[in-house]
C-alpha cells in the first residue's frame, strides 16, 4: 500500500502540535486517494548552531480546516451491525461452500466407483467373448465330427 505524505507547505495537512512534534497527515491507498487519514508525528528537526530558534506557533483552533471522521460513538454501533450482517452472510456462504464441496466429493467417489465397475464389466466381457469363441470352436468340431458319424451311419445302414 502506498502512503502519500503531504508536504509541510500544505497548511491543512501539517503543523506544529504544541508539544514539540510536527504533525503530518498521510493518506493510504492507491494514487493518494483514500477515505481515512492518519496522523503521523515526526520529531522536530535538529537545530544547527547557525540557525535561529523560532518559538513554536501558538495553538490555534484549526478544527474548521481539518476534516474529522464520524464521531466515534456512532462508529461502533454501525460497525457492529454491519459486521454482524457481514458475519452472518459469510457464515451462510461458508456453509453453502462446505455443502457444495461435500457434494462434489460424494460425486467424485460415485464416479470412481462407476469407473471401476465399468472396467470390471469390460474385463468380464472380454473373458466371456474368449470363452464363447472357445465354445464355438468346440461346437463346430463336434458338429463336423457328428456329420462324419452321420455319413458313416447312413452308409452302413444302406449296406
From Swiss-Prot:
Keywords, alphabetical: Coiled coil, Cytoplasm, Golgi apparatus, Membrane
A GO BP annotation: regulation of protein complex stability
Coiled coil segments of this chain: 78-146
Topology of the protein relative to the lipid bilayer: Peripheral membrane protein
Pfam family, any one: DUF2205
Subcellular location: Golgi apparatus membrane; Golgi apparatus, trans-Golgi network; Cytoplasm, Cytosol
Membrane spanning stretches: none
GO cellular component, one term: cytosol
Main location: Golgi
Tissue expression from the record: Widely expressed with highest levels in brain, heart and skeletal muscle.
PANTHER family with a match to the protein in the record: SHORT COILED COIL PROTEIN, SHORT COILED-COIL PROTEIN
Protein's recorded name: Short coiled-coil protein
